[in-house]
Amino acid sequence: MAQTWHRRWDDSYAEAAFKNRLNLPIKYVKLNKDAVKPEYSQDGDAGMDLTATSFRVTDTFMEYGTGIAVQIPENHVGLLFPRSSITKSAPGVSLKNSVGVIDSNYRGEILVRFELPYPGTVYRTIPIVGDRVAQLVIIPYPRVKFVEVDKLSDTNRGEGGFGSTDKQ
């Protein structure tokens, strides 16, 4: 029995499992003719670029539609981040909810909403339809179960919160 277990978890098994994680198929639907398949720009990129197919703006936000819906596998999550070029060209602009979370059971269009921190400000450069506006990072996550206890284990940090690791 131990021999079977060992064979199952040898290097070739681990390598095959890892390669399957590297080529995780993600189903997607183009919701309009201008939609662009999310893709990595370069080898080594963690996020796939999302391209704007629609745009609307109010006094407090600008919103881009990507024209795509995705089917993220169970036990995975899509995290949405702004491209650095957005924050470089429009200082102070950030994603409305900091990081977008796309759950595996969501099937609607991926929308990217940026907060405009200074109402009435005219930005010289903002992304337009056809520009890459965000990055989608898909990662696995554990399904956790909280267990109530009377006391947590002790650590060097203890209850030190904001900025506590800078103080010795």
Residue ranges and their predicted role:
Residues 1-168:
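DUTPase catalytic domain/fold
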